[in-house]
Amino acid sequence: MYPDNLFWNVNLYSICLTLGLISAIIVLDKYLTHRKVPGKVQSFYLIVGVVAIFMGIISANLAQSIYHFIETGEFKFGKDGAGMTFYGGLVGGVIVFFIGFFGFGKIVFKENEHIKYCSDLFAVAPCCITIAHGFGRIGCLFAGCCYGKKMDGFPGLWMHTPDGTGYFLPTQLYEAIFLFILFAVTSVLFYKEIDWNFVVYLVGYGLWRFFIEY
């Protein structure tokens, strides 16, 4: 849609990623405060979470670079790389998070206070993931890197792509809308203290991906 830089090396994709990260941090803070999780534990969750996010971004780039290398024989990583893949980032981020949570947590909390509020963390995590992911998908739409099949009109969107100019199914836009709806659903469940958020997220997003892909 508009992959060009707005100023310096900043484009709409990077702005959306930043908005997603900030939104996830705000949600984590506000929601855990509502559950009366101690400040020290919240800060620990935040630090480990931010580190996991950044490592997830790296692993998302790396996973896509490996896939691109297998497909084309060319390894591209970083600013001029092949892009990112969500599942590569999710797996890498989760691994780093658990290492930090159980490894570093044992050092910081002698009485395992961070584990005491683990259920609250797992309840809020899908809320943070969905809102951040939603902004990320909008960023993908602006970058023009992902789109569906060519169409004659609605529900397609007029786009300039490597496959030509015309109406293409804006899969990232519809996925962003779905993710924001899923964020609202998991938020309601969180505040009602119905801690089925991870199940709702995994099943809901899994079904959505199957629907949008096939």
Feature map (PLM): residue ranges:
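Hydrophobic, membrane-interfacing alpha helices
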Residues: 1-214
